[in-house]
Regions:
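Gly/Thr-rich phosphate-binding beta-strand-loop-beta motif of the actin/hexokinase/Hsp70
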Residues: 40-63, 149, 159-183, 199, ...
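Glycine-rich beta-strand-to-loop/alpha-helix junction loops that act as flexible
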Residues: 92-98, 168-170, 250-259
Length: 289
């Protein structure tokens, strides 16, 4: 708003205790500047994974909206989820879904005339050092998660502990980040659904209904499901022990569709962060404070 002091031919004023009148008038130029500023501050953030794409529109006050789209439905984004989405000024993302997914995503962004910036891993960024044998070959989603985890850890602890960063999707990646922000290495194991599907497809007598987690499973369905969860948890706890002799000091950050299922059965401290990759993408793109 623009404040005018004094008289105006069309102003409806009333006396004030200061001897002059204040009249609030909308400034077209100010309104235009506000609209432009809002546009410039909107960033569309993309995490294209193996099975689904997570995305979010980030504004100056945080996330405006968040969404998840199966990879098979990316081609309909502009007609559905993104149909009424405000135009972003910028799009940044990571893509491990392959070239075909990249082409489909870019086609959906064409309606806004926005070309996405695809990010990859590097030797160093945002306080994190990448010790992969060939740093650029580390999955971009894993790199973004490591950056986000380090930012969270340093924001809450003066002396941040070592941490294990887990993305539990189609595959489960388990990455070790030491107290100096150095990524030491990581594991890739089949995800829960992949383990269950593999048993069902390759073992003739194990086509059973979905099971539940039990401390001592007494039926085949529960034995299969509990075994898959325990396999993932065992790999995570082993990585904790490798990075610190006292695994109770190692924080675990979990993201991905199966994160809540796995997190329930891990020793604390555990933090499930739904949009860990998106946070890391924003940090790498220089959009987070």
């Amino acid at each position: 708003m623009h404040l005018e002091v004094g008289r105006h031919p069309r102003a409806q004023t009333r006396p004030s205790g200061l001897g002059f009148a204040l009249r609030a008038r909308a400034s077209p130029r100010g309104t235009a500047r506000s609209a432009k500023g809002a546009l410039l501050s909107r960033v569309l953030v993309i995490d294209a994974g193996n099975s689904r794409m997570k995305w979010g529109l980030r504004g100056p006050r945080g996330w405006v909206t968040l969404g998840v789209t199966p990879n098979s439905e990316i081609g309909a984004l502009s007609l559905r989820d993104w149909h009424n989405l405000p135009r972003p000024a910028r799009a940044v993302g990571v893509n491990v879904a392959g070239e075909a997914a990249r082409v489909r995503i870019e086609a959906q962004l064409a309606r806004w005339r926005v070309t996405p910036e695809w990010l990859g891993a590097s030797e160093f960024a945002c306080g994190v050092t990448n010790r992969y044998a060939q740093p650029a070959q580390l999955g971009a989603d894993r790199w973004a998660s490591l950056v986000a985890a380090w930012r969270r850890s340093t924001a809450t602890d003066l002396f941040p502990p070592a941490c294990v960063v887990v993305n539990a999707g189609t595959a489960v990646t388990i990455d070790a980040l030491d107290v100096d922000g150095v990524f030491r290495g990581g594991l890739i194991v089949p995800g829960l659904r992949l383990m269950l599907a593999s048993l069902a497809e390759n073992t003739s007598n194990l086509k059973v209904p979905a099971g539940a987690f039990r401390p001592f499973p007494d039926n085949t369905a529960d034995a299969i499901y509990t075994g898959a969860v325990q396999a993932a948890c065992g790999a995570i706890e082993q990585m904790r022990r490798r990075i610190d002799a006292d695994p109770g000091h190692v924080r675990c950050y979990l993201a991905g569709g199966a994160a809540p299922e796995i997190g329930l059965h891990l020793d604390p401290p555990v933090e499930v962060v739904e949009n860990l990759v998106l946070e890391g993408v924003l940090a790498l793109a220089g959009e987070m404070p």
